[in-house]
Amino acid sequence: MSHEYDDYVSSHEKPVKAINWNSIPDEKDLEVWDRLTGNFWLPEKVPVSNDLPSWKTLTEKEKETTMRVFTGLTLLDTIQGTVGAISLLPDSQTLHEEAVYTNIAFMESVHAKSYSNIFMLSLIHI
């Protein structure tokens, strides 16, 4: 079976290979992967409503400034998730490094989504 697989891989210009997390050529890939997955969070799990009392103490100018900053951060995270991190994929040295970059791209999209939760809550309570 291994011989057939090797023949298949060598006969295709850009073969698709399965990642093997049991054999990692660059230990830095595992270190970064573990750090990224250890820091994983979802905006739905963060009780943004706990910040409402503080939000209500802000002046209108402070609220407007905060919303503008969040708008810019949403755009930045969107670009980082759909252009930035993805653009690094062709330079990946290993499949594990590719996995790290796609994880980063995913988390940037999660970050962009988190601002939507903040926007929605602030609009309801303005």
Can you describe what each PLM-predicted range is?
Residues 1-49, 56-58, 62, 93-99:
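Extreme N-terminal leader/anchor segments
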Residues 96-118:
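Amphipathic alpha-helical hairpins
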Residues 59-90, 110-113:
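Alpha-helical bundle segments that constitute or directly flank the non-heme di-iron/ferroxidase center
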Residues 124-126:
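Conserved small/polar residues in nucleotide/adenosyl-binding loops
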